[in-house]
Every structure is written in structure tokens, then in C-alpha cells.
A protein has these predicted regions:
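A conserved, positively charged/aromatic
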Residues: 106-136, 142
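A short helix/loop element that forms part of the nucleotide-sugar donor recognition site in Leloir-type
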Residues: 167-182, 235
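Short His-centered aromatic/hydrophobic patch
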Residues: 85-91, 109
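N-terminal strand-loop element at the rim of the active site
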Residues: 9-66, 228
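A conserved mid-protein helix/loop that constitutes part of the nucleotide-sugar donor-binding site
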Residues: 17-25, 187-210, 232-233, 308, ...
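Aromatic "clamp/platform" in nucleotide-sugar-dependent glycosyltransferases that forms part
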Residues: 252, 271
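A conserved nucleotide-sugar
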Residues: 35-38, 183-188, 201, 205-248
Length: 317
């Protein structure tokens, strides 16, 4: 199939998480449909990132207007006719560069942090220069139209998705548990997400300390990375609650689908979440989920059917 659209896909960074998965899947899907896609990242990604043709322009700290001219050059060189930018600074620089060349920009908002949806100079400029706006959930759509005052007719919702494979069987679960060296009779809880407070790991640990008095065969595995202070804070809480025997920090994993298949329950009581692609991935593995009734999670979990929704920052629940 001949290329019909030439697209710049632009992202600020490529840490592990839903935004990176969505960025990569979008590129793959567009290419499979015969479109030309130029992927661009404004920071050097980790070695595990594998996106063919990825270009990098490293953004300096603070506002860096030279990026507008660098992006403009790429747009002209590659004859781009539409820009898709993910998150605020990518949207800012790309939309201005595109506007100067008559190229329209679609801006997708992924942020969980509610502060990113407050009126400010950057968001005002994005509104001026971008053409269409995408929210990853209806919850975030309301922030675009009510907080940022973006025109409703230019705002859209596109949920994230994942590939649905075969539902795990007892045999496949036993096999992957053996591979991951997880006892077959262990009640395995799993969390996947960076170690920042916003993901609610501290609440999971507090709840676990209450559960082990009833069932000492429970073990929590936490997959994800974080800053040194974040790691230290959670490790200190594990020691304070005397959970050393019941918690394993896995660090960053590249085989999260295996851990999801192995677990009995996926648990992540996020303080805030724009969408929560990992909950979709857990559902695709037919796993019950314990999550919080915040952000886009409410659009994924069916209470009492596919999981439980609890209030945020309420481990006693």
C-alpha cells in the first residue's frame, strides 16, 4: 500500500508506562496501514526502547525555543503533513513549528498529574497553535473543556488498548510461575508502575500489613523503577511494617505480560490516573483488579464484575 499520510509522532520522553506503549503502538499501527511515520523523542531513551527510525533531539532544561526551528527543519525535510504530539512541551514546540508551515497538530494529553491541566502560558499557546485535542479518558476530556476551556468540538476521547491473546489456562499459569520461580500455592499480588507516590504503592503496603494476619501465604511483587528517594521511602515502609518476607521489588521488567499471567490479583491503588493502560492489560489476562475510583480507571473496571474500586489513599478499604 502506498503512503497516504506523512506523520510526525513526537514525545517528550520514553519511560516505561502507558504513554510509551501507546506511542509505540500508534507508530506500528500507522505503518502497518501504509503511512510514513517519523518518530521523534525530546530526550535520549533507555536501551530497552526499540522503535525503528526513532530520532532524538535532546531538550535542554527549561523553555528551549531552538527546538521549534529544529522540528521545523525535520518537517520540511520529511514532507510531513500532520503532527501528533504527546504531552505539553512536545505539543508546544511542534504546534508552533507546524503552524508556521501550515501543518496541523493533534495534541494528545496523557498526564495523570492534575496540575498539568491548569491554565498557564504553555497550555494557552498549545490551544492557539494546535488544531485538535485528544484525551485518553472521558475524565480527562472534562478537564480539557472545563479547566483549560478548549473548544468541545475540537476535543475527542481515544482510549488506549492492548492485544487480547488467549485467556491464560491453569497449565500456562503454572508454567510461567515455574519460569519466574513463584511458588504454585502462593497468593500472588502484583503491581506494575513507577515508584512515585501517585501510584499508591504505600497504600498497598499498608493494606498488606493488615492482610497477613489472616493469610501469611500472600506475597506482593512490585514491578517498576523510581528515584533513589522513592525507592528508599518504600523500602523503609516495608521495614517499618515488617513486610520483608512478603514483598519483592522487581525493578524495571521487560516481560510484564508474564508477570500479569502469573499473578492472582493485580492491585494498584493510584492516587490519580489519566487512563491506566495497565488495568486493561490485566483484564486482557483475565485477572481481577483492585484499583481506585479515580481518573480513567472508572472507565475500565466494572465494579464487582472485573474488579473492586476503592477510594484513593484509603488502605483500610
Amino acid at each position: 500500500m502506498a503512503s497516504t499520510i506523512r506523520i510526525l509522532e513526537l514525545v517528550q520522553s520514553l519511560e516505561k508506562g502507558g504513554r510509551t506503549i501507546r506511542f509505540s503502538d500508534t507508530i506500528s499501527g500507522l505503518r502497518e496501514h501504509g503511512h510514513f511515520v517519523l518518530p521523534l523523542c525530546l530526550s535520549k531513551p533507555k536501551q530497552w526502547v526499540n522503535i525503528p527510525g526513532l530520532q532524538i533531539i535532546e531538550k535542554q532544561t527549561g523553555i528551549n525555543w531552538t527546538l521549534v526551528f529544529q522540528i521545523r527543519i525535520l518537517l520540511k525535510q520529511n514532507k510531513i503533513n500532520i503532527i501528533h504530539a504527546h504531552c505539553e512541551f512536545s505539543q508546544l514546540y511542534a504546534s508552533i513549528a507546524g503552524f508556521s508551515l501550515g501543518i496541523k497538530t493533534v495534541a494528545t494529553f496523557h498526564r495523570s498529574d492534575l496540575a498539568k491541566y491548569r491554565p498557564n502560558l504553555v497550555n494557552t499557546l498549545i490551544q492557539c497553535f494546535a488544531s485538535q485535542f485528544v484525551a485518553v479518558s472521558h475524565d480527562r476530556l472534562s478537564l480539557l473543556t472545563e479547566s483549560l476551556k478548549l473548544p468541545a468540538n475540537k476535543c475527542h476521547v481515544v482510549h488506549g488498548g492492548t492485544i487480547i491473546e488467549k485467556v491464560p489456562t491453569v497449565e500456562s499459569i503454572n508454567k510461567v510461575r515455574e519460569e519466574l520461580e513463584i511458588p504454585q500455592n502462593q497468593v500472588m499480588l502484583l503491581s506494575i508502575g513507577h515508584l512515585g507516590v501517585i501510584k499508591g504503592h504505600q497504600d498497598t503496603l499498608t493494606a498488606l500489613s493488615q492482610l497477613i494476619s489472616k493469610n501469611q501465604n500472600i506475597h506482593l511483587y512490585i514491578a517498576g523503577d523510581g528515584s533513589a528517594p522513592e525507592k528508599q521511602q518504600l523500602s523503609a515502609l516495608v521495614e517499618k511494617l515488617q513486610l520483608q518476607k512478603y514483598v519483592t521489588f522487581l525493578g524495571q521488567v521487560n516481560n510484564s505480560f508474564k508477570w500479569l499471567e502469573a499473578c492472582d490479583i493485580f492491585i494498584q491503588p493510584s492516587i490519580e490516573e489519566a487512563f491506566g493502560l495497565v488495568f486493561v492489560e490485566a483484564g486482557a489476562k483475565a485477572k481481577p483488579v483492585i484499583a481506585t475510583a479515580v481518573g480513567g480507571i472508572k472507565e475500565i473496571i466494572l465494579p464487582e464484575q472485573t474488579g473492586l474500586l476503592v477510594p484513593p489513599a484509603a488502605p483500610e478499604e
